[in-house]
Amino acid sequence: MRKAGSRARAEAEGPHRAMEGGEVTGDRLKADTPDVSFEELLRLQGQGRPKAHKQLVAGNSTRTRSPQQPVCVADKHRPLEMSAKVRVPFLRQVVPISKKVARDPRFDDLSGDYNPEVFDKTYQFLNDIRAKEKQLVKKQLKRHRSGEERDKLQQLLQRMEQQEMAQQERKQQQELRLALKQERRAQAQQGHRPYFLKKSEQRQLALAEKFKELRRSKKLESFLSRKRRRNAGKDRRHLPLSKE
């Protein structure tokens, strides 16, 4: 009687124990096997067939598995991903940045070679503008008889005259070089060997042309007097100091 009572008690408690086990994994079993009833799963567990139960759960889970996401192709321009646990090396490879170089069009090869003759012809209008500015400065200089403003105008007029004289000297040198080039070309056409003047000889010819121009403009005496005073001042620097 005791054995029959214990067996009946076990059969009665069997479903209850299965239900207790189902409280732990019931939600998961329902999610994995939506097509199988919960009572069928408990019956399989109670009959001691865990293998069939696992196969049933595994088969339903494979059917309900969501499709995989498409694999994205990595972009070669993406930022470099590194682990934060990796120690940064002492010498790192830094991406070099191109240095900005200042470009002056006056000295750039893309602007072409400097030709004084072409430059003077292209910017011939600047001489007229300088002449008008010089006349304007002279008029303003007549209005200011004294004071700081007159000194500034006097210095400006002197600088403009010096620039004009320097431009005339450059023009004379260009004309002299052009004449020498034409003379050498004529000698080559006649069958003679062309003679190239030295720089010292070119300076002497330029000085002779300058003296001729000063004589024509009646400024030779003033030029020679200034040159004498300049040379005298240079000689005084080299003289020994007088002892008193």
UniProtKB/Swiss-Prot annotation:
Disulfide-linked positions: none
Coiled-coil stretches, from where to where? 141-190
| InterPro entries, sorted | RRP36
Q: Which UniProt keywords apply?
A: Coiled coil, Nucleus, Phosphoprotein, Ribosome biogenesis, rRNA processing
Q: Which GO terms describe its cellular component?
A: nucleolus
The sequence motif named Nuclear localization signal is recorded at: 226-229
Region (Disordered) location: 1-74, 219-244
Chain positions with Phosphoserine modification? 61, 66
Q: Which GO terms describe its biological process?
A: ribosomal small subunit biogenesis; rRNA processing
Q: Which domain of life is it from?
A: Eukaryota
Tell me if rRNA processing is a UniProt keyword of this record: yes
The UniProt regions of compositional bias labelled Basic and acidic residues, in chain numbering, are: 8-33
Q: Where is the composition biased (Basic residues)?
A: 225-244
Q: Which family does it belong to?
A: Belongs to the RRP36 family.
What is the protein's name according to its record?
Answer: Ribosomal RNA processing protein 36 homolog
Organism this protein belongs to: Mus musculus (Mouse)
